Amino acid sequence: MIFGKYINRYYLKHAPVLLLGLAALLTVDYIQLLIPQLYRLVINGVNLGQVVVNGETLPFTKEVLLQHICLPMIWIVVLMVIGRFLWRICFFGSAVRVAADLRERMFDHSRRLSQQYYQVNKVGNLMSLYTNDLDTIQECFGDGVLMFFDALTLGLLALYKMWTMDVRLTLLALIPALIMFAIGTQMSKVMTRRWEERQEAFSGLSDFAQENFSGIAVIKAFVKEYKELQAFRKLNKENEEINVTYTKIATLLEVLVTLFVESVVCIILGYGGYLVYQGRFNAGQLVEYIGYFEAIVWPIMAVSMLIEKTSRGRASLNRITELLDAPIDVADRPGVADLTDPKGGIEFRHLNFRYPDGEYDVLRDISFTIAPGESVGIVGKTGAGKTALVDLLLRTYNVPDGTLFVDGRDVNSLSIHSVRNACAYVPQDNFLFSDTIAHNIAFGVDDATPEDIERAASMADVRDNIVDFKDGYETVLGERGVTVSGGQKQRISIARALLKDAPILILDDSVSAVDTSTEKIILDNLKNSRAGRTTLLIAHRISTVERLDKIIFLNEGRVEAVGPHDQLYASCPEYRRMVDLQRLEDETKGGENA
């Protein structure tokens, strides 16, 4: 059994079912101890020709054998089968439900963690929590409860029977048990540490494999298959060594328990045989005593298994606890209100921001205003802080008080859900789900019709590509959309955002993978369909944003200039230099192609 703040509540929640299983277990354990008494009757009947039943001496006949031994044995077996089926359903069924509840709780907590958490913790490690560690918790909860109570009840009942038959023999038999308990306690601590190391090693191996499968195209392009194989072999070898070490300890524990069992058998046969020789035991009583000891062999063996499972369960619970204890950095403050009837006005006031654990501010004294319905471009060199602005607007990170306003209201006074719901977002990494194209486009709108989906695809200029696929909109995309080209992936992502028709549309470098003619079509469609709605377009190419209402030019985390393209070109030397360089690059490429 394992205990912890995230597991204890389930013992109470499933208490009725566990108590029913415990009652069935107690019944099975009690009637199981009637079997050694039947052994005694058979042995004494064969040796003495008579048996004592309920204080009455009866001749050992076929009728007595059938009525007082065979029929009771049949009933005992039937009741044991029914009881064991019942407690298995109760204990193991509860364990499955506990794992399901805990998995849901983990997922619910995970979705509320900030983006920073996922930048620090690798996907492979997180996935191992939902697979290996949860499986261990499930096994430990079901088997652990069973083994604990079975070892306790059957062991105590059998020891009581043994004690009433001969105190001295029972005390001698308990000496190895005390030694085993002391050894097992120390080994449990070692096994907990080793299991944690095992799970960490498996997480590293899983994460490495996941990254390689995701980046297989890059690996092949750079002909690094053998190098990655060697790295995998190294991690796999480390994982193997840790597993072998753990297996050695578990095997040693099992051997020690077996040694203990055999030691007790020697004591019973030696001293018990002496008691028979002295006439204090008859042969039937010795067999009965051995039968009681055989009944507690399973609890004794269960002790080693319980120690191992508890060690594993405790280690896995510690890892899961780290996830559930991870603080929710970005959360609503008490008393926040919803952003109702959003218009799309955005204002930054002297905002300074650095990423958690960052060494310097990526945004410095940022101030600008976007009126509702404006189309605004945000440009700047790589690392200028363009994406950081989007992260703050979407409340991916905490925003300093009084520095960011939506429709004139501080975002910290608004619920995160309502602010995000007022936005449609196309990120740099155009993530698509392993689902149909239709479901990907309709991801943000639950009641989208096929006509709505097709209209959004047309505005993103991806409709013709989709209908060319064999299954059209029902085409199932591979993981992260690998079955479509980069440009198609971007346009499907744009269609998804356009379908939401949010007051604020944010496109973060979202047309970089399409040609200039396709880009022009998309931008024209945006202009026509987004009239009166705010659009933010982050781009590297000036041609993407030069026709927008105004452009915000960022340079080294500061707002260098704000205004229409012509105004910035005339008044801002840095902006003009960037425009001229891009035009020169375009002319050079055009000359080469010619």
Which residues does each PLM region occupy?
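Helix-loop-helix
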Residues: 161-175, 245, 249-318, 324
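Transmembrane helices of ABC transporter permease
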Residues: 13, 17-30, 143-197, 268-281
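Residue-level recognition of transmembrane alpha-helices
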Residues: 21-22, 70-73, 77, 151, ...
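Conserved catalytic Walker-motif region of ABC-type ATPase nucleotide-binding domains
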Residues: 110, 232, 320, 348-350
